[in-house]
């Protein structure tokens, strides 16, 4: 069973097995990865019946959508360098009924992923609780690996953050402080260590449209947001990828691209179930949301594929 779980536990000791600086520091040419968000097993029925505060007692739809995503990604040629799931893996909050089974069923669906494609997990509010505690963070790490860490892919430095600490760290101030010390260290390293690009992955967006927008459930509080943007720009961060909104959104600000991707699972707007294809070239990050049906039937868009040549 331990070996069976290892695919979900590669993020350890604040790094990621197989995607370390020693192994992946050098630029090796254009590549792409897949960003997915919010499979959130259990939300679709809960949203339909207006009972989102419960854990969601049915999730067959989300399981099938996750399997469709996995099958479509497995068929892509060339293969993506990794898949990152940007939080809200299941709907049931820590300690809620159905949570254990939702996690099991999501893992079963994800086990179909080509073993050559690493799975990177980001923690969301439904994974940790809106106000995380040491216990809920420990539970997440037990199931999915570290809640924050860095990794390298082909000369690109990637930072996975626990954005719930930015939202409400009142239940775990010491963990928040450790995260802050680590993040500052990583951002300083980004300045001092040559990399082709620096990318950030977190669940909650910095902003949905513009950095000066009003505070909202779906973005980070303005003071925190502005401070992070300043730090990210100083460190040369090119793009921040998130989910949480269950709609596509985002915008560029002074060279920083805030990318908000809609969900594999429940849609709260006019988008459809999908994932984002992200192409990394020597000078640019180019990305486009693909519906699961499109990805299944036609694969990634040809103009994106040509960028890999």
UniProtKB/Swiss-Prot annotation:
Entry keyword set: Cytoplasm, Hydrolase, Metal-binding
Cofactor(s) needed: a divalent metal cation
Main location: cytoplasm
Reactions that this protein is recorded to catalyse: O-phospho-L-seryl-[protein] + H2O = L-seryl-[protein] + phosphate; O-phospho-L-threonyl-[protein] + H2O = L-threonyl-[protein] + phosphate
Matching Pfam families: Metallophos (PF00149)
S-S pairs: none
Cofactor note: Binds 2 divalent metal cations.
Region (Catalytic): 47-250
GO molecular function ontology, one term from the record: metal ion binding
Family note: Belongs to the metallophosphoesterase superfamily. CPPED1 family.
Name the record gives this protein: Serine/threonine-protein phosphatase CPPED1
Source species of the chain: Danio rerio (Zebrafish)
